[in-house]
């Protein structure tokens, strides 16, 4: 997993796995934000699967799936709200 540090307390990467959730937890991440729609790729774990694993680790999960064709001011406001309220450090992932 290649993690990019975007700001203090906020990182991102491509799709994560259940094992990578454990790694993020070990690194001190407190919340995970998923911007990827379920079913985008056959090998992609469903968000519910990741949520169950994350909950067992004590991570807070947020789900705001979108397609780039659907980007709007409303979506950006929702994204901003989630990023602001998510316990830090937070990690977001997409495709």
Model-derived features: where do they sit?
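Cys-dependent protein tyrosine phosphatase-like superfamily
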Residues: 1-91
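Short cysteine clusters
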Residues: 94
